[in-house]
């Protein structure tokens, strides 16, 4: 076991886990008894989906997020697979579309109605047929619409293009055939240009998902990898598995060199799989153990020692699977930075656990909520398949704010209600470079900035405080006058703070629009 320093300066040093109360949990949920090492749970701001037991085939439940408490024993299921469901994933760009894979060697795409299900949903939108054996994993592309990856027990990863009217897709657009055994996990980097996998041969591979060639391969004997995860834009990988002495272990890798890990850490001697989760906004890493109730969390940095242990959430209720809420579904008013949904089979319970940063102020905490990935794709399927790469579109989590990184792309689907609204007066999309040195888009921004400055009278100076001229009035003579002036100044300070926050957000939006235009000009 590695030694952890007792103190470290970090704004996340005192993050703690807060389990939901009994009435805010999901009770009497028939959770699957499958022995596969998958999450079995998928969450978005509208629904929680969980794989369940079903006679005569595979099924999963889709429960509205607000419908907590005891579940009706006859609650409708999503069923249509002929074998057990092994994995489910929500479309990151459509909160009402979910993919499922099964032992029947098929993948199905489902449209979930916005209203509450009243009977079993058996009609799927698309069926993907191509694997020769059962399909164990599905993964949506992180920035591209309608691109889905699947991994089967035929040792193949298949790339599917769903941008078609066909209800049955009889073959993938690409098959990655570089594994010698069953694929255990898949993970994309930030822009989806690289795919990392772990295999039953305990090797980590970094694959070009379009060409299907192996770019890097780890054959380090001291670490038998089970799960792998890209760590955002840090150009690092995190894998969990076992050491030579069968201790549960995690290892950090440089994605450019997988010969030897940057660091290794033995955790304990339990046998359950370790599920890693990374929050690229806060650079926090969470390690969740299957079969125990603990959640360890670390802070990741570019400098040594790279991984800094923070603390651990402990619980007596062991989790069989785990789901996580996307950042856009968190409660920013309570300084929530991550949320887990633990599947507790011993109690037929789904328990939300919120990771909270303790803050005294109730205002929006800008430092712990940087811009995060929005529910809008930055590429179409055709663009990605033709070789384009682009990072995710960003949004602010501040209530009532706009998309910060709005690319000039046609929207693939309407935004969900939980997402922030786009400004009613966006910049005009650029179809070709301007003739006068490509300066036309910047002139639009200059006009917009000038108009905004004029509307807010930034060039004027005022000495009035709530109609009270501080330079013309004599100093207060009585205690009552002093109190009146004090309260007026307090109210003015509060109003100015709110105005300053609004202007900072608007300034950041304008800066990001300029950045986006420059990037777009560079691609033309």
Curated annotation (Swiss-Prot):
Region (Disordered): 403-436
Disulfide linkage: none
Positions in coiled-coil regions: 484-523
Biased composition (Polar residues): 404-424
Gene that produces this protein: Coro2a
Subunit comment: Binds actin. Component of the N-Cor repressor complex, at least composed of NCOR1, NCOR2, HDAC3, TBL1X, TBL1R, CORO2A and GPS2.
Species this chain originates from: Mus musculus (Mouse)
PANTHER family: CORONIN, CORONIN-2A
Short name of one Pfam family: WD40
Signal peptide segment: none
An example molecular function term from Gene Ontology annotations: actin binding
This protein's name: Coronin-2A
Ranges of the WD repeats in the UniProt entry: 80-120, 130-170, 178-217, 220-263, 269-308
Record's keyword terms, sorted: Actin-binding, Coiled coil, Repeat, WD repeat
Bilayer-crossing regions: none
InterPro entries (UniProt xref): Coronin (IPR015505), DUF1899 (IPR015048), WD40/YVTN_repeat-like_dom_sf (IPR015943), WD40_repeat_CS (IPR019775), WD40_repeat_dom_sf (IPR036322), WD40_rpt (IPR001680)
């Amino acid at each position: 076991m590695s030694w952890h320093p007792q103190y470290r300066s970090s704004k996340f040093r005192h993050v703690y886990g807060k389990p939901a109360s009994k009435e805010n949990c999901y009770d009497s949920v028939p959770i699957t008894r499958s022995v596969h090492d998958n999450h079995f749970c998928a969450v978005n701001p509208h629904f929680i989906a969980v794989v369940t037991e079903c006679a005569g085939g595979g099924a999963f439940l889709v429960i509205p997020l607000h419908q907590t408490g005891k579940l009706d024993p006859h609650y409708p299921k999503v069923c249509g697979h002929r074998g057990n469901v092994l994995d489910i994933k929500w479309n990151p760009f459509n909160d009402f579309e979910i993919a499922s894979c099964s032992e029947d060697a098929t993948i199905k795409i489902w449209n979930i109605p916005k209203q509450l299900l009243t009977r079993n949903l058996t009609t799927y939108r698309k069926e993907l047929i191509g694997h020769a054996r059962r399909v164990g994993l599905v993964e949506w592309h992180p920035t591209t619409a309608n691109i889905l990856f699947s991994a089967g027990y035929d040792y193949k990863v298949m790339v599917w293009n769903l941008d078609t009217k066909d209800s049955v897709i009889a073959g993938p657009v690409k098959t990655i055939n570089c594994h010698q055994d069953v694929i255990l996990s898949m993970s994309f980097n930030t822009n989806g240009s690289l795919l990392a996998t772990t295999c039953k041969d305990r090797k980590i591979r970094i694959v070009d998902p379009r060409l299907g060639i192996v770019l890097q391969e780890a054959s380090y004997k001291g670490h038998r990898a089970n799960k792998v995860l890209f760590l955002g834009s840090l150009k690092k990988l995190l894998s969990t598995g076992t050491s030579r002495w069968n201790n549960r272990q995690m290892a950090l890798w440089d994605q450019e060199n997988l010969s030897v890990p940057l660091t290794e850490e033995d955790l304990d001697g339990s046998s359950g799989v370790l599920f890693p989760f990374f929050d690229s906004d806060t650079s926090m890493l969470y390690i969740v153990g299957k079969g125990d109730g603990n959640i360890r969390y670390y802070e990741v940095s570019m400098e040594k020692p790279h991984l800094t242990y923070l603390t651990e959430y402990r619980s007596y209720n062991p989790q069989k699977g785990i789901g996580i809420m996307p950042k856009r579904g968190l409660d920013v008013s309570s300084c929530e930075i991550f949320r887990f949904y633990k599947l507790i089979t011993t109690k037929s319970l789904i328990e939300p656990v919120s990771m909270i940063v303790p803050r005294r102020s109730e205002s929006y905490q800008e430092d712990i909520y940087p811009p995060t990935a929005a529910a809008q794709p930055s590429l179409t399927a055709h663009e990605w398949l033709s070789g384009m790469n682009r990072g995710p579109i960003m949004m602010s989590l501040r209530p009532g704010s706009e998309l910060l990184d709005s690319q000039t792309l046609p929207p693939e689907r309407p935004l969900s209600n939980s997402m922030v609204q786009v400004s009613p007066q966006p910049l005009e999309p650029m179809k070709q470079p301007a003739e006068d040195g490509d300066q036309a888009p910047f002139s639009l921004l200059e006009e917009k900035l000038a108009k905004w400055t004029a509307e807010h009278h930034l060039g004027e100076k005022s000495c009035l405080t709530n109609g009270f001229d501080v330079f013309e009035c004599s100093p207060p003579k009585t205690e009552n006058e002093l109190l009146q002036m004090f309260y007026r100044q307090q109210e003015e300070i509060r109003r100015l703070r709110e105005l300053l926050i609004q202007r900072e957000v608007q300034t950041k939006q304008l800066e990001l629009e300029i950045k986006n235009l420059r990037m777009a000009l560079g691609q033309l």
